[in-house]
Amino acid sequence: MNLAYALSVIGDRWTLQVIAGLLDGPQRFGELAEALDGIAPNVLTTRLRQLERDGLVVATPYSQRPVRLAYALSDAGRELSGAIALLSAWGARQTGDAEGPLHGECGTALETRLYCPTCERPAEEGVREALRWI
């Protein structure tokens, strides 16, 4: 049920790419369109409006005449950064692209791990079998 909801919000071709384009901070429409190679302006407009309705993006006017907006992620939108990193790493492995997500400081390919904030440690390999989805 939770996965179905998540996919209903972010499960089309462009939505996660729009969110990923906003992970580094607010963007104006033109900047975002340029960064998302191949997206039609009407598709970007539709996605941004829907993401705003879904509470993942916040639009802030930076010009009144004409009205122009800058787009930024809400807290809920920023929460998707981990999912985007996981999907990006998976895509890199499937396509043989050695340039999956990299650590900004040293350039090493990032790995994703399950982590328990209560125990303050990563889940061990044997523990993963006991994972429950709540």
Which role does the model predict for each range below?
Residues L16, D54, A83-T95:
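Alpha-helical linker/hinge and terminal dimerization helices associated
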Residues Q27-L32, L80-W90, E99-P101:
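Extended, folded domain segments that form the structural surfaces/walls around functional sites
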Residues N2-I39:
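N-terminal helix-turn-helix DNA-binding core of bacterial DNA-binding proteins
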Residues G11, S63-L86:
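Basic, amphipathic "hinge/linker" alpha-helix immediately C-terminal to the N-terminal HTH DNA-binding motif
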Residues L7-V9, L48, A72:
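Basic, helix-initiating cap at the start of DNA-binding domains
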Residues A89-I134:
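C-terminal regulatory/oligomerization modules of transcriptional regulators
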Residues F29-Y62, P66:
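Canonical helix-turn-helix DNA-binding module
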